[in-house]
């Protein structure tokens, strides 16, 4: 049987404060059964993507604050949960610049897999590609989770929503690399004749895998996570991605999600998808194109 999905439309037919989608977020959460997800006194992980340096279209802080306030009203102890891309200090600085902090959101922002993405628990998935997933410790130990996902396009899975937010965003760096390697077995290919020696590729790498030698990129294949950020940062096609195997990527993501969700009771997870600012690229990208469809609204479900 299909799960019920509740929708809060983006269009406001009457210009009244009470009709604002921000104001109506608590009603949406109530309709989907948030009171069954939040247990008084228990921590509640509010999982969301904090964006990248240069991006600008993540979920707006005022929406997140409404979710936080609702959890508090129900007696829960909310915290914003995200995993390392750069190290925790750099990522929290990016989050603060974008308006995600204790003052604006009303709860702590926690990098749940530790300073360098090494704090995790191994969980079996039963999958074929990702047999074991490294679930971030802060997710593993949380009794409840509310998944706030910004719906976008994606270069490998075509669509990015709750599955990508959980499968990639709730796991430690080692599992992120494993999933990326499922589609990109080899590191980016470098064409020296096209290189303008601008250095933008090195700035885009969050993993220290790309260094400049005489202003030309040199990739360490051991450190490279195959995220392909450097290829998107290169405007001269000097760094290009190898031919991808996208079916493997989507399967690996799904297997990772299965492992993450196995650490929760099924009734203790709620999914909220923001179908607004739907860009062709996901929020990991260092810059984002204009939205490809008009804003639709916010979807909420227990599945």
Enumerate the predicted regions with their spans.
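Extended, low-polarity segments enriched in aliphatic/aromatic residues
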Residues: 2-48, 53-63, 69-303
